[in-house]
């Protein structure tokens, strides 16, 4: 059995061209590979979309095209990206194969013995190939099941906090999910003994995973650990949420288990590392395996200056690169007093051949040192001594000037400042 695993499509106005180009290419490739079933593991949209919005129409068209080829399972992703109910419209597509929307914790079986590519367009059996459990899991493997999917949608952390308290929510979430996942081991074992492929689908963060920008995720509020996910007994765990493809495995042959993020379908931000694409999962007598199928994600280029942008270096970088179709980000770091010396217009003109240009300047604020306890001193001389100590300045000349300012009349100070110096007078006489 072949399963195509797509994730984090993020359809919305901001990323529409990138998302649609990459997802369309992925659907084309999935049809070419003759996959048996497709899984979208969350965040199909970037935020709530109006049904008449171009992003919604394009997403519906692509999912319909995919569902005309094979059954499709769509999982509820992050609530801020896919508010509850966002995916409900996909149940009504009327495609050749029904789209199953997993918006609750459940198990669902892919039914039927025939491969979708062997069914005729008029075959009624193709219209409804999904059987969902009434509760969180099946009591037994449904007869005729071709595969069993364990669906764990994105967790509403606010609900967890309301139940156990905000301070305990982070650890309680992980503990409750770990217990839930362990409870699936029994039914997964029965399915595997019957030769039925077992898959888990979820959306969240695995402790120790790495983001698309190369940052390890090692906090205490992450949903999963690899141990908890392996404890389900599923052969394959299809994950969404992290935009970088990565995988963990254990066991060999028929006992092999694999956990994998597909990563985002496209490159939505600057600095994202590695290829973008989707996963092709293959189940056979030798176990399960997956591989990344790349999509035509956009190319990005970062040009970084430690100080003010050097236009000569920038032009040299432009000559060394083919900028057509490339998204360029220029970053620099300058002191607060030099911020107005950066010519943004000149930078944009130098990069006019790029698909788009993003300018990011980091301003280093001026830091004024304040002597600790200076406000507690009564005399101005004591305050000057404290400041000189804090700033490592030689104090006696400052104190001499202070003495003159406080003990001499202003007219005398001005007259002395305007009077010619002794050496100047002697020089003129010579």
Predicted features and spans:
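Extreme N-terminal starter segment of soluble prokaryotic enzymes
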Residues: 1-4
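Divalent metal-coordination and catalytic microenvironments
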Residues: 8, 23, 38, 43, ...
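Active-site environment of divalent metal-dependent phosphoester hydrolases
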Residues: 12-13, 46-49, 75-86, 108-111, ...
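Core catalytic region of metal-dependent phosphoesterases/phosphodiesterases
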Residues: 15-112, 131-137, 226, 230-234
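Conserved beta-sheet core of the metallophosphoesterase superfamily
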Residues: 91-98, 206-285
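Conserved catalytic scaffold of divalent metal-dependent phosphoesterases
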Residues: 92-222, 262
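Binuclear metal-dependent phosphoesterase catalytic core
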Residues: 106-145, 257-329
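Accessory, non-catalytic peripheral segments of nucleic-acid enzymes
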Residues: 283-430
């Amino acid at each position: 059995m072949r399963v195509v695993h797509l994730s984090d499509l993020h359809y919305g106005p901001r990323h529409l061209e990138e998302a649609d180009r990459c997802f369309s290419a992925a659907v084309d490739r999935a049809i070419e590979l003759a996959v048996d079933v497709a899984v979208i593991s969350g965040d199909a949209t970037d935020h709530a979309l109006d049904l008449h919005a171009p992003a919604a129409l394009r997403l519906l068209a692509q999912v319909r095209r995919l569902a005309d080829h094979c059954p499709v399972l769509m999982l509820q992703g992050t609530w801020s990206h896919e508010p509850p109910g966002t995916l409900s419209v996909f149940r009504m597509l009327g495609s050749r194969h029904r789209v199953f929307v997993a918006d609750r914790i459940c198990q669902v079986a892919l039914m039927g013995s025939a491969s979708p590519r062997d069914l005729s367009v008029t075959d009624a059996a193709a219209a409804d190939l999904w059987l969902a459990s009434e509760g969180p899991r099946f009591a037994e493997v449904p007869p005729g099941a071709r595969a069993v999917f364990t669906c764990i949608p994105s967790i509403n952390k606010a609900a967890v906090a309301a139940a156990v308290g905000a301070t305990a929510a982070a650890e309680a979430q992980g503990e409750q999910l770990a217990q839930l996942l362990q409870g699936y081991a029994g039914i997964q074992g029965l399915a595997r003994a019957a030769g039925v492929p077992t898959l888990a689908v979820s959306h969240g963060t695995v402790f120790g995973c790495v983001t698309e920008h190369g940052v390890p995720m090692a906090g205490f509020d992450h949903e999963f650990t690899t141990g908890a996910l392996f404890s389900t007994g599923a052969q394959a765990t299809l994950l969404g949420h992290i935009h970088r493809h990565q995988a963990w495995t254990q066991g060999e042959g028929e006992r092999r288990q694999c956990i994998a993020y597909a990563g985002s379908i496209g490159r939505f931000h600057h600095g994202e590392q590695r290829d973008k694409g989707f996963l092709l999962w293959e189940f056979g007598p030798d176990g399960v395996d997956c591989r990344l199928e790349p999509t035509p994600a956009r190319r990005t280029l970062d040009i970084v200056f430690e100080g003010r942008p050097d236009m000569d270096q920038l032009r040299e970088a432009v000559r060394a690169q083919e900028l057509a179709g490339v998204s360029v980000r220029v970053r620099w770091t300058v002191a607060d007093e030099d911020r107005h010396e950066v010519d943004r217009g000149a930078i944009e003109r130098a990069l006019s051949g790029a698909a788009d240009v993003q300018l990011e300047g980091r301003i280093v604020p001026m830091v004024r040192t304040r002597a600790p306890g200076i406000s507690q001193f009564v005399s101005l001389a004591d305050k000057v001594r404290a400041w000189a100590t804090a700033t490592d300045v030689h104090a006696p000349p400052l104190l001499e000037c202070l003495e003159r300012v406080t003990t001499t009349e202003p007219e005398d100070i001005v007259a002395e400042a305007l009077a010619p110096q002794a050496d100047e007078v002697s020089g003129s006489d010579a």
